[in-house]
């Protein structure tokens, strides 16, 4: 279970599931804010390793993934082939994906279901890529209307004391199209 996290500027993407020596089974990633992850190597937001045993029963929901473009990830949810093609019962739903995307960056592999995600980029690339690949009949393709993405502070560690940062700018406005758009 990976939940209630705030990650930013990581080399890799938001989530990487690595099967081996057995399958990754019944993993859940939820309630997380990811800002500019995949920044340095263009890693995908979500990478599901297939492997010999695969990723089975994975749920990725109610997360916000935001990235700004050049030099950052341009891949939403690809899978990676390691020894075999096993991906079963993977659900990606009720997420906000905000940032540009490249062609082929959404996995269309059998066993992955996408639904009720909000997908947006100001240049329209994320919407185009997702529409062409995800088969998400309930997707929303509008700006989620964050209050102010520059209103983010980092935490500190000084003299043995931790001060948490905030990401208040990623709250959505009261008339956001994301409100009531998710599956129950």
Residue ranges and their predicted role:
Residues 10-11, 179:
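Flexible loop/turn segments at secondary-structure boundaries
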């Amino acid at each position: 279970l990976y939940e209630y996290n705030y990650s930013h500027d990581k080399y890799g993407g938001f989530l990487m599931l690595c099967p081996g020596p057995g399958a990754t089974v019944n993993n859940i990633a939820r309630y997380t804010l990811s800002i500019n992850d995949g920044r340095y190597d263009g890693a995908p937001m979500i990478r599901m390793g297939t492997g010999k045993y695969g990723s089975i029963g994975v749920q990725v929901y109610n997360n916000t993934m935001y990235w700004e473009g050049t030099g950052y990830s341009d891949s939403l949810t690809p899978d990676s082939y390691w020894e075999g093609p096993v991906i079963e019962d993977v659900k990606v739903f009720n997420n906000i994906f905000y940032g540009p995307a490249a062609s082929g960056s959404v996995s269309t592999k059998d066993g992955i279901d996408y639904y009720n995600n909000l997908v947006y980029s100001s240049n329209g690339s994320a919407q185009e890529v997702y529409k062409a690949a995800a088969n998400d009949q309930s997707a929303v393709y509008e700006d989620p209307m964050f209050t102010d993405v520059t209103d983010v502070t980092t935490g500190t560690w000084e003299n043995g004391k931790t001060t948490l940062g905030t990401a208040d700018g990623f709250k959505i406005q009261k008339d956001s199209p994301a409100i009531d758009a998710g599956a129950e």
